[in-house]
Regions:
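PLP-dependent amino-acid enzyme catalytic core
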Residues: 1-107
Length: 107
């Protein structure tokens, strides 16, 4: 990621930030418009940055449907699986959990 991206990060929407970050890993595997749709579906809830002091803030990722930070990753994974499963084959996702993972993935 470029220095310019981080210098101007406050000018980007949540969707734009997510797109620029994930694009580094996805490349051209998912078309831009489809990837934006997946991201929009993933970050449709509020995740505020809360200041702790003048130099430290925290990103609250627990405002999603299951109140787990895993809602972000689980929703993104599910949307990507749907995109790549063009033949509508039955998929099985095996999850081991000791807490909130199951609810986030089941949703």
């Amino acid at each position: 990621m470029s220095k310019k991206f981080f210098e101007n990060i406050d000018q980007y929407s949540n969707e734009e930030i997510a797109y620029h970050v994930i694009k580094q890993f996805i490349g051209d595997e998912i078309p831009k418009d489809v990837l934006y749709g997946i991201i929009k579906n993933t970050v449709h809830f509020d995740f505020p940055i809360i200041p702790i002091n003048d130099s430290i803030s925290t990103l609250e990722l627990f405002h999603g449907p299951t109140m787990s930070f895993k809602d972000v990753g689980a929703a993104f994974m599910a949307s990507c699986l749907s995109y790549f499963n063009k033949n509508n084959n039955k998929l099985t996702v095996l999850v081991a959990t000791s807490g909130d993972t199951g609810g986030a993935v089941a949703r």
